[in-house]
Amino acid sequence: MICGLLPLLHCYNLFISNQFCYIRSMAQQKTGNEVKEPFTEYGRYSYSDYLGWHMDEMVELIKGRVFRLAAAAPKRIHQKISGKVFNRLFNFLEGQECEVYEAPFDVRLPVNSKKNEDIDTVVQPDICVICDKSKLDDLGCLGAPDLIIEILSSGNNKKELKNKYEVYEESGVREYWIIHPYEQTFITYTLIEGKYMPSKLFTSGDIIVSSSVAGIQLDLEYVFQDLD
């Protein structure tokens, strides 16, 4: 629930920065990324609906509501950081049991039923690591990845900080990393007894060690260098 998230976000206002600190009022508002389309007669869209869409823009489905990924292509710095992180993880995991994927890659997060018509959350994380290969199919991933990494962009900060935090926690994503490319900061959330526990605020010079995927380490000096 958002009430559980607010104290954590407040404690890390340096990470979120001043422009994101209105997240408290956001809980009562629709985000600007929500696609203005009429809902189906039953009130929410499902993955079955999602599969039948032919849209010019990329969208995600979060608890039955449609959100655009961004108004435009991700910024250069976002893509540069994404490429650096993905390449490091791919090289480390090559030949191992776990696999890493980058967007666009559908991650379906079922609540109870795994039927397409019952799934109402389909997201495209910037990067995700899946160690249980039974969750992988031709459509992407069905079930919670072990590790999800999101890189904030100016158009989607609300979605990452509120909506995705909630669905990742509820779905059992064991570890969730958030990278702020312009603040050059990094925070991790580790799932403990069904609730996310935040790390300290990391920045350039720190080494991130994954708690969910053995052996994964990420040097933030490498991630944040040469971004200009």
Language-model segments: what does each one mean?
Residues 10-228:
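Gly/Pro/Ser/Thr-rich low-complexity, intrinsically disordered segments predominantly at protein N-termini
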Residues 3-4, 32:
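Residue-identity detector for glycine
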